């Protein structure tokens, strides 16, 4: 799963570092290029929940293989873009494939990871993703003097097909069916797994899901997380180069600083969530990193907006991003805690709302630069989101499943059902 996270971020993060090169080739303004970023995030938001439900109904193994192959194809197709419109369309189709990656991951972890280790496992997963995102900027910066941006995309696209082959040969949807899993390991996986939950079918399922306060809070609190990540991989290189004059030789490393700093906090956020859960219960374990992480991020991003020294501005942005990412593993662990066998759909709903915030940020940033030449706008936008996220974390209750406990009868459009399977 860590290698999947790395492939995912490799393919999506590279476009930000290539941005100025692609802009020069197609003659695009900042506002126009914002729609390239927008198209990816829009598709990601549109297809995340449908893909999650598809995986819950058809099995994660096959769905995962198909979506990784899909986005790898469109990474290659992006390299063949011949004008602005083709670039926007191919990034949209690429985003449609990547949309299901993390909800599928949540479902895999709900089946394979013991309850007491969920936070740590999520932290390791996202640490790997951010390591890939950070290294991508450095690698692309190093390759651009020798290869065209198109050739680099072809290289990255081929990596996904290697992963699909390995995944399809190794993975099983049920750990009990895997020949390498022994009885002791299976008992550990199943030991603390919460009971399955009964749920209605069809529209009643969605109506019940969206009425849950926990789901609505998760949707709101994940917005700053996604908006921050996309700012780092899309606009940050331009900010550092245009606002503070960093040269291209140093740009890759400086632009990667927030993601490098986030590697440790991604892991630590998950680890400390598990430690606090074992000592004080799951409510304290999930809430604490979320509240502290966002509160610190709000302070650091405001300091970044006021910094005049280029190095200090970069450091404050890195601190804001890294403390923000303390919240990632607890958020995804909470999705599994309350979603159970529907964890893919719950995490998809949360992540989709995050993409909506990131979608809104793209034209806000792009056109504010074109019209006002003002880089403070994204920083204050993020600061407001961080405050909102911290407040939402204070009310999340990971002990309450989104559906009724197993065996409880639920009404589904005039009929009664206690089915658990979809």
Please state what every model-predicted region is.
Residues 16-46:
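Extracellular/periplasmic helix-loop-helix junction of adjacent transmembrane segments
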Residues 27, 59, 80-86, 97, ...:
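Helix-breaking motifs and short loop linkers at transmembrane-helix boundaries and internal kinks
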Residues 125, 129-171, 175-178:
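Helix-loop-helix hairpin linking two adjacent transmembrane segments in secondary transporters
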């Amino acid at each position: 799963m860590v290698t999947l996270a790395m492939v995912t971020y490799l393919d999506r993060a590279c476009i930000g570092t290539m941005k100025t090169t692609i802009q020069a080739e197609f003659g695009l303004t900042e506002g126009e290029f914002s729609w390239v970023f927008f198209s990816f995030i829009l598709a990601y938001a549109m297809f995340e929940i449908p893909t999650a439900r598809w995986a819950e109904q058809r099995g994660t193994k096959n769905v995962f293989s198909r979506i990784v192959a899909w986005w790898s194809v469109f990474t290659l197709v992006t390299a063949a873009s011949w004008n602005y419109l083709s670039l926007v369309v191919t990034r949209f189709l690429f985003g449609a494939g990547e949309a299901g990656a993390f909800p599928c991951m949540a479902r895999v972890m709900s089946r394979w990871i013991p309850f007491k280790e969920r936070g740590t496992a999520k932290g390791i997963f996202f640490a790997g993703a951010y390591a890939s995102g950070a290294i991508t900027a450095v690698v692309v910066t190093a390759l651009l003097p020798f290869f065209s941006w198109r050739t680099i995309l072809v290289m990255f696209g081929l990596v996904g097909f290697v992963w699909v082959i390995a995944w399809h040969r190794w993975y099983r949807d049920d750990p009990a069916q895997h020949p390498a899993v022994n009885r002791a390991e299976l008992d550990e996986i199943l030991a603390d797994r919460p009971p399955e939950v009964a749920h209605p079918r069809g529209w009643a399922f969605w109506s019940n899901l969206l009425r849950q306060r926990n789901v609505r809070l998760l949707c709101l609190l994940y917005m700053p997380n996604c908006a921050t990540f996309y700012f780092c991989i899309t606009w940050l290189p331009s900010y550092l180069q245009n606002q503070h004059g960093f040269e291209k030789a140093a740009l890759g490393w400086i632009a990667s600083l927030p993601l490098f700093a986030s590697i440790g906090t991604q892991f630590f956020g998950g680890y400390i969530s598990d430690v606090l859960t074992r000592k004080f219960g799951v409510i304290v374990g999930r809430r604490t990193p979320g509240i502290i992480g966002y509160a610190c991020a709000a302070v650091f991003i405001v300091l970044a907006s006021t910094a005049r020294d280029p190095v200090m501005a970069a450091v404050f942005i890195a601190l804001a991003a890294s403390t923000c990412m303390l919240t990632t593993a607890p958020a995804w662990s909470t999705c599994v805690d309350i979603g159970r066998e529907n964890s893919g759909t719950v995490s998809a709903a949360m992540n989709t709302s995050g993409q909506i915030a990131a979608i809104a940020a793209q034209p806000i940033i792009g056109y504010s630069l074109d019209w006002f030449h003002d880089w403070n706008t994204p920083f204050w936008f993020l600061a407001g989101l961080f405050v909102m996220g911290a407040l939402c974390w204070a009310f999340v209750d990971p002990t309450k499943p989104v559906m009724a406990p197993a065996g409880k009868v639920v009404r589904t459009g005039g009929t009664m059902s206690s089915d658990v399977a979809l």
